[in-house]
Swiss-Prot record:
This is Peptidyl-tRNA hydrolase. It is an enzyme of class 3 (hydrolase). It catalyses: an N-acyl-L-alpha-aminoacyl-tRNA + H2O = an N-acyl-L-amino acid + a tRNA + H(+). GO terms for molecular function: peptidyl-tRNA hydrolase activity; tRNA binding. It is found in: Cytoplasm.
Amino acid sequence: MLHLLVGLGNPGKEYELTRHNVGFMIIDAIMHHFLFPDFKKKHNALISSGSIRSHKVILAKPYTFMNNSGTPISSIVKLYKIPLDNIIVFHDETDIDFCTIRIKKGGGNAGHNGLKSIDTLLGRDYWRIRFGIGHPSNGYDLSYHVLSQFNNLNAVNNTISNIIEHISLLFENDKSIFKNKVKDLIKYTDISS
């Protein structure tokens, strides 16, 4: 069965390593760790196909900027006939503590424009991995916060490594096992921002 792993972010050098691009960072790390071929631009996204422990996987990074992420994802889903239950979207989340991971299926988009775009074209019945980037301090502009770089990139990379270590659990029916494994590993990692 084919799975689609999507990382949300904005294309361009100026957005690399920003909080809003943590989805792209996760997909890049998965690609390198599991030796996927280089990304090719198709359907307005960067795409690579390979496998993760015998599971066929397409990795995708929409290249339409965050607010229009749904258009390329919808094209990929329709072309490859991927069921919504086999779609996992990695994205930043300001309402979650820094480097905390939450997984859920469906639900609201909490004002995240990338998710809003996907919801509009595909509905909400897909999986989301929410990567906590923390909320800005009082008086700090939210858009500046999400578009600025991480203060503690080591903690981000450690959390991404924890995700990769247990990613094959995402292809199982009970995704809470993945959540618990990653959460337990994060407890023992220095994640102060």
